[in-house]
Amino acid sequence: MGDRPTVIALHHPPFHVNSDWLDTSTLQNPEELFAVLERHSQVRLVLFGHIHQEFNHQRHGVHYLGTPSTSIQFEPQSSKFSLDRKYPGFRLLNLYADGNWETWIERVAYAHQLNLAATGY
């Protein structure tokens, strides 16, 4: 990987996100990923999706950032499938050569029809 600040992007979260039904879809071997990352201090960020919600966590100096969906949002910290009323969104990043970064979430004001009685997606 070299010494340059590095960002890694995944689809599935590498650990639980405190949502019982989503926590069944994490990486199957997260400890292997963590072991590699701990040997490469230039990794500053790990980005992931799948959870359709904003999520921030830090572990051993690495920031893990979950990203909302450009479609429907899932209710954070829910025990079963549940939709959130938040608008679709996405995460933006500014990455700097010195390894610093900033991030924020943008929401799209789109009033889509939600089926709040849905039991899956």
Question: Where are the language model's segments positioned?
Answer:
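Binuclear metal-dependent phosphoesterase catalytic core
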Residues: V36, Q58-Y121
